[in-house]
Amino acid sequence: MTTGNWWAAALCESVNGEKPLAVVCNGEALVLFRNATGELCALEDRCPHRRVPLALGTVTPKGLQCGYHGWTFNGSTGMCTTIPNLREDERVPSRYGARAYRVAESHGFVHVWLGEGSPDDSPLPGADYQPRGSEFSGAAVVNIAHGEYLAAMLDGPECLLEFGSVRMTDFFLGDPRLEAGRLVVDRGAVWTTRMLPPAFVIDHPLIVRTAVPLEGGTIRVELLDADEAPLVTLSIASSANRRGTTSLCWRGFRHDTRVPGAPLRWHLARARARAPFRIHPMIDGAALAALLVAPSRDLAAARAARFAPVSEAA
């Protein structure tokens, strides 16, 4: 049985053949780079010789060279190919190597296979993200544990992100539902204007849809109009970092949907090619603590049901 998952660890454009990129994905320290042929590579970010981070090294035609003693590692296999102080008649022992990970590119993200099993029969996540027009992307490490980040994305996404000229409400439009391995929640939203009505709103011209994966994958967030036509789509990769923090990288775009009722600021931002959303790099602890636990209960229940042993599930 396959127990591993594909995890989006970085944006494709962040990984090159000049400087290795250090990331922490699902708690594992990795180094990403491209070899001399442009092939994407992922190794454990630790030299087996003196445990120095390989991300401090240099990409060479032969692989990734450790910055401490110059050991060089093949990016595809992790095998050590060069040790500078060996004589010409000496060979590098085959047991010397760094752990290599299966890695792939898809829909603008670098995905790394973490865990047991083979990824051959596991499709890469994010196939439902099909950008059109200009994209807006970024990365951050935020001050919240990964499990809490996913829960807040369901209970109160306004603590984590915002859409320009939009105010999210706590009015849920229907019950949470499972779709393609994600728990999906719809909530009402309104345009923010100087003539903003009272806090109690009965008409919601906008919908914010958040879809959180049960395991691995990417978070999908959409801003929709009342007829569920998409206005903005985001794909957010999240995973556990160190000391209770969360690694994020994201991509998003604005659709060509006409929005007659949008305020002038929305149209001006579009004309000036400004990002229609913002991912908060710092989380407001007071706002997070005030969130009521609601749809995230269903996320915990769905995970328990999905990953329960066969005997228990029966």
Each model region followed by its residue ranges:
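Generic detection of intrinsically disordered/low-complexity segments and helix-coil linkers/edges
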Residues: 1, 63-67, 185
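Hydrophobic, proline/glycine-rich low-complexity stretches
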Residues: 1-5, 23
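Acidic, low-complexity intrinsically disordered regions
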Residues: 2-3, 67, 109, 262
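Short, low-complexity intrinsically disordered segments
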Residues: 4-5, 69, 111, 189
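Glycine/proline-rich, flexible active-site/cofactor-binding loop segments
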Residues: 8
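Rieske [2Fe-2S] iron-sulfur-binding domain
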Residues: 11-125
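C-terminal catalytic domain of Rieske-type non-heme iron oxygenases
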Residues: 123-314
